[in-house]
């Protein structure tokens, strides 16, 4: 897979992640100094947002993050500090390992612009990697998929349903 940086096509290095596949577990240092392990089974849906530049975080994306921050673990990962609109407990510049494992690594100074949604079972249910690092995300689709993932109810044998309770 490739992305465009300043008009030049760059090959994204390392792994390409497929929908339904298991997300890799990654330890990330957040800007507040905490280390968090992300990408595994979790009590909430997880969202990984990789942003290439300091100014990549738009007010529209920030609004979606704010709307869903209590219902999902939302992480912003970038090679550069993103500024005041971010929560240091959920933001990281420790991007290289995640970018490699998620297939969005460009080089030691840059990652592709991407969105990943991981369900509670630790599986990828949505991904978007922009064609150009300057392109906008499809935020309407992202919000729809995030809402679906948060409100997904597992089907199958549940004792209470089986007993008619």
Where would I find each of the regions flagged by the language model?
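Chalcogenol-based redox active-site neighborhoods
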Residues: 1-165
């Amino acid at each position: 897979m490739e992305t465009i940086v300043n008009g030049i096509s760059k090959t994204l290095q390392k792994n390409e992640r497929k929908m339904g596949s298991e997300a890799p577990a990654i330890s990330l240092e957040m800007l507040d100094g905490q280390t968090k392990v992300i990408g595994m089974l979790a009590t909430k849906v997880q969202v990984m947002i990789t942003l290439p530049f300091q100014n990549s975080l738009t007010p529209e994306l920030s609004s979606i993050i704010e709307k869903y921050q209590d219902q999902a673990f939302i992480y912003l990962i970038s090679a550069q500090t993103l500024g005041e609109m971010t929560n240091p407990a959920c933001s990281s510049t420790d991007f290289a390992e995640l970018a490699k494992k998620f297939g969005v690594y460009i080089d030691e100074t840059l990652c592709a612009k991407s969105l990943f949604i991981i369900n509670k079972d630790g599986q990828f249910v949505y991904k978007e990697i922009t064609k150009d690092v300057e392109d906008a995300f499809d935020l309407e689709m992202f919000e729809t998929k995030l809402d679906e993932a948060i409100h997904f109810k597992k089907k199958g044998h549940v004792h209470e349903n089986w007993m008619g309770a």
